[in-house]
Amino acid sequence: MHLRIHARRSPPRRPAWTLGIWFLFWGCIVSSVWSSSNVASSSSTSSSPGSHSQHEHHFHGSKHHSVPISIYRSPVSLRGGHAGATYIFGKSGGLILYTWPANDRPSTRSDRLAVGFSTTVKDGILVRIDSAPGLGDFLQLHIEQGKIGVVFNIGTVDISIKEERTPVNDGKYHVVRFTRNGGNATLQVDNWPVNEHYPTGRQLTIFNTQAQIAIGGKDKGRLFQGQLSGLYYDGLKVLNMAAENNPNIKINGSVRLVGEVPSILGTTQTTSMPPEMSTTVMETTTTMATTTTRKNRSTASIQPTSDDLVSSAECSSDDEDFVECEPSTGGELVIPLLVEDPLATPPIATRAPSITLPPTFRPLLTIIETTKDSLSMTSEAGLPCLSDQGSDGCDDDGLVISGYGSGETFDSNLPPTDDEDFYTTFSLVTDKSLSTSIFEGGYKAHAPKWESKDFRPNKVSETSRTTTTSLSPELIRFTASSSSGMVPKLPAGKMNNRDLKPQPDIVLLPLPTAYELDSTKLKSPLITSPMFRNVPTANPTEPGIRRVPGASEVIRESSSTTGMVVGIVAAAALCILILLYAMYKYRNRDEGSYQVDETRNYISNSAQSNGTLMKEKQQSSKSGHKKQKNKDREYYV
């Protein structure tokens, strides 16, 4: 008796689980791409403009910091809708501190910094940008021995660039522009020649994980005293943000905002400019002015024992004293930058700020200050007409202040102001009463050719109007004669900020971007800010090789790192699922079906047990089942 078991393998079922694995594989790829695109799109809304960056590393001691990929930001963030804010730093020092959120700290390969300032101090820090603690990267704009300079470190050694030609602590308003691209840098003050620096050797290029911007130098013990206006750094207008009470900004010490629009001027009609006509810096220069001869007016000279220089009045006493003055002889020159410590100020300021000068500074100047009996002069003088308020009572001449430190002028809008509202002004903008009998047909302001068509000229009253202008040094040195038979007196630099005050609506022309006026085709990848005009951009190339200026690159470290981690985790999880599914299908695969055939064969006689007969039986069995040898297997029991 033997059992016959037929083993038949069923057809393979591979296509079912193979399709499942393929489905999971493509799902893994699609999910990874989707997660990466979501992270990139969410990061691009808050990152700054930049171009492609290479994968670079900084080595600070034993720490190794990897730099993620760069994120693009719209160039629109470089523009604003109004002029830059202005802050006065008193003699006791102050600090404006902006701190980036912990998850939004940028790393940059190139930087742009610009600010307007005026001061008389010989040493002080204007702006300093520091990286996160432990990294040591920084960028600092400072005045040393009266000269402006920048020092920065991005991982190797301190690199410095300085304007050696002329001191900038002369009390005049200056605009400084700094660009960095890798280790190369440029520095320009006003329209002076550009200083360039190309360090030798291999330099690291990334300013890692920027954490805070400190303005004023109080945290480093090098106090800045004077005025700062329209600070711009890589798309951030920090002073504007401070004026808007940004939660990431803290203000300490003797710091005062000027240029606010008070509630009493809430009904004043102003003009709004498009973003293309906005800028962040307002520049003033020492100017000439005519004054109305009045009774009870006198001049007061600076006492040699005092270091304070009062700038914006016609009498030496405070306006609250109501002290009448004797007539002045005219011809006085006043330095336009003067501030004071703003500790106790009245609700409506009646006095301009003053600044403490060095003990060795004894200017032989006379100062004139306005008392309240001079307020009638404002109504007589009038104000420049707004371009959108019609042309009644106005002529064709209008004078405004240039946005660059070279004395350029152009037409703009200047809303009417109240003589009492000092805090609506930028404290260093000088206002003058220009008689049309003297300046008839003259001093017509001209804007640069590429931007002159954006403005309509203001008009001045036939009698006289209070206007603002910046004149050449030759005109500043002019002194009026006291003879009654000559033209009216023109005392130089009368600082009366209360008669006419520039408003935040005064908008200066920005620099042309990479799009030219007559064409919308992009000529170069250069991204400019309103204060960078014709400033060469230093590129991180080999020494002596200079390329076309590149765009600022800002890398959002936290968002890109998060996206990378999410993508890796998702891919790893999907791969593990695929592996588990494959193992499950392998262990539970179909081994085939088996059929057992039981038959009984009885031995009829004992002779069949002989070996010969057994062989014949086996041969006959093989021949009988020859067709089924591949299907059936016989097992003898």
From Swiss-Prot:
Record keyword rRNA-binding present: no
Residues annotated to bind Ca(2+): D137, I154, I206, N208
Record keywords, A-Z: Angiogenesis, Calcium, Cell adhesion, Cell membrane, Cell projection, Glycoprotein, Heparan sulfate, Membrane, Metal-binding, Proteoglycan, Repeat, Signal, Synapse, Transmembrane, Transmembrane helix
Topology class, membrane: Single-pass type I membrane protein
Biased composition, class Low complexity, residue ranges: 43-52
Record has Transmembrane as a keyword: yes
A GO cellular component entry from the record: trans-synaptic protein complex
Laminin G-like domain mapped to chain residues: 85-255
Composition-biased stretches (Polar residues): 298-310
Region (Disordered): 43-65, 289-310, 605-637
Signal peptide: 1-35
Glycosylation sites: N184, N252, N296, S312
Annotated CDD domains: LamG
Location relative to the cell: Presynaptic cell membrane
Transmembrane regions: 563-583
Spans within the Extracellular topological domain: 36-562
A molecular function (GO) term: metal ion binding
Gene Ontology BP terms: adult behavior; angiogenesis; learning; neuron cell-cell adhesion; signal transduction; social behavior; vocalization behavior
Organism domain of life: Eukaryota
Cytoplasmic side: 584-637
Function of the molecule: Neuronal cell surface protein that may be involved in cell recognition and cell adhesion. May mediate intracellular signaling. Functions as part of a trans-synaptic complex by binding to cerebellins and postsynaptic GRID1. This interaction helps regulate the activity of NMDA and AMPA receptors at hippocampal synapses without affecting synapse formation. NRXN3B-CBLN2-GRID1 complex transduce presynaptic signals into postsynaptic AMPAR response.
Quaternary organization: Weakly interacts with CBLN1 and CBLN2. Very weak binding, if any, to CBLN4. Specific isoforms bind neuroligins NLGN1, NLGN2 and NLGN3. Interacts with CLSTN3.
Protein family (similarity comment): Belongs to the neurexin family.
Protein's UniProt name: Neurexin-3-beta
Gene designation per UniProt: NRXN3
